[in-house]
Amino acid sequence: MSQYAPFVKPYIEYNEFGWGPSDLPDLEVPYQPFCKGDRLGKISDWTTPVQERKYNNNKYMSTFGSSNSQYAYFHGNDDASFHLVNGNNMRALKPYQRNRYRPTQRNNLRLHGRNGRFNAAIGAGHGGAGAAGGAGASNKYGKGRDMRRGQTGRRFMRAAPVRQRQSSVVVRSDWVSIEEIDFPRLLKLTLPNIQEGADLITCGTLEFFDKQCDRINVKNERPLQKIDRIINVPGTIDDPIIRRLSKSLGNVFATDDIIATLMCCTRSNYSWDIVIDKVGTKLFLDKRDNAQFDMLTVNETALEPPLEEEGSINSPQSLSLEATIINHNFSQQVLKIGELEPKHKFDEPNPFEEPGVELASIGYRYKQWQLGDDMVLVARCKHNGVLRSPGGELQFLSIRALNEWDSKAANSVEWRQKLDSQRGAVLASELRNNACKLAKWTVEAVLAGSDQLKLGYVSRLNRKDHLHHVILGMQQFKPQEFATQINLNMDNAWGVLRCLVDIMLKQPDGKYLIMKDPNKPMIRLYDIPENAFDSDNNDGEETSDDRPFLNSKDNKL
């Protein structure tokens, strides 16, 4: 037995009292560190080349490709002479044509070579498609080209950041919300067959339009002058004519700018508010004292409205003040001003005259409309000038001005380059950026019964100078035709007004507020106390940070 090697029995642990492994610890067992909290899947590998990201790409795809080299098998001898044939679908280049399409062929050669190199690099990173034909193989059109196209699309299709606008008035805790109406509901309303309003009282004095202003163009521009005239714009309750008419006529009383704001509310983005006093069966729609209701907005409906920059001449507050002053000066400069110039006087004088104050040329019409169901609207409308037609008839005008401040910052067309040759492009740009303002001007002209709506184009003398301006041209429209051109449905406008009036007439007597939500396309109706806007209860409520366009100007220009 000594000639054979000894046989030693191995020790086997036997569990005599149970089923399963014994209590002895595991020794010499292959082990790789891991964490029980890790998700089952692909462990991050920072040693592989950086791969191009692609939308909806499988995050576990490269686990089974050749790029996961942690557990890959390498054999350097047998595969040393192995080379992968390029499997890309190479499009054959067109034969060279002498002196023809030379730039196209040169670009074709350059782009083709660039795409080939790019695809090879991407393929090597995605499972070795460029070197081993793994799971990251190129598709029909080339993986690199698709990736580059996808990245470009995401780069230029980023959504603009949402800007939080400030409310026109701070909603207090003691205000009771009555109703919230979103714009899609308002856009479905309609009230057809509203007849032209009937004149009740006409008052004021109008000056004649200077026809020489129609000849102004870019090459023959005219400086905008500062006209020291005052336009008093009292509210509905402060109007003595409306007070007199309310005793015998109508049950809804307002001004043309208030009605236009309600009719065009679905086009507005900035916040605004209107105060309503209900007394018995009568409604008085009015604006708050010292509010910025009469200020004009600039680029309100643009894709990129002006930024809130304190102290900047291109902030919404500064542009609003600039546009309001331009509109006032322009409406007076295009008229024949002088003691000897002819004037058209209405039946009654201006009810807002003040001794020692020169008033602007303006005429008022107090008109009434039948809205059905014994509802009569009485409103104060206005004209800015008058013109005698070739036939000798008087035509009443509504004169407004559009202003250019910085075409690059506003993402608009350059007026000095396009106004004479492509005036339609300029107007289309303004309709896109100032849709609400133009719609309200059109509604005011339609309500007043103006024969023409004259629009002036006023630009800065220098884009960095907001104090000096020039007139570059004028354009005139018939209000009804212009409403159709800008897609303004008057039946829907009357329907919106009637809907809001019906809601208010159902409420008990008191004071109410209609407010456009600053950040949502909806209007809100509140029941407010009688002293909601008194000076004693208004301390700390409305500041320059609470309302847009505050501390810009006083109501009087």
UniProtKB/Swiss-Prot annotation:
Against Pfam families, the record matches this protein to:
eIF-3_zeta (PF05091)
Alphabetized InterPro entries for the sequence = eIF3d
Basic and acidic residues: which segments have biased composition? 545-557
Keywords (alphabetical) are: Cytoplasm, Initiation factor, Protein biosynthesis, RNA-binding
Q: Which domain of life is it from?
A: Eukaryota
GO BP terms: namely:
cap-dependent translational initiation; formation of cytoplasmic translation initiation complex; regulation of translational initiation
A single Gene Ontology molecular function, please?
mRNA cap binding
Main subcellular location: cytoplasm
Protein location: Cytoplasm
Q: What does this protein do?
A: mRNA cap-binding component of the eukaryotic translation initiation factor 3 (eIF-3) complex, which is involved in protein synthesis of a specialized repertoire of mRNAs and, together with other initiation factors, stimulates binding of mRNA and methionyl-tRNAi to the 40S ribosome. The eIF-3 complex specifically targets and initiates translation of a subset of mRNAs involved in cell proliferation. In the eIF-3 complex, eif3d specifically recognizes and binds the 7-methylguanosine cap of a subset of mRNAs.
Looking up PANTHER family in the UniProt record yields: EUKARYOTIC TRANSLATION INITIATION FACTOR 3 SUBUNIT 7 (PTHR12399), EUKARYOTIC TRANSLATION INITIATION FACTOR 3 SUBUNIT D (PTHR12399:SF0)
What family is reported? Belongs to the eIF-3 subunit D family.
Domain remarks in the entry? The RNA gate region regulates mRNA cap recognition to prevent promiscuous mRNA-binding before assembly of eif3d into the full eukaryotic translation initiation factor 3 (eIF-3) complex.
The entry's protein name is Eukaryotic translation initiation factor 3 subunit D-2
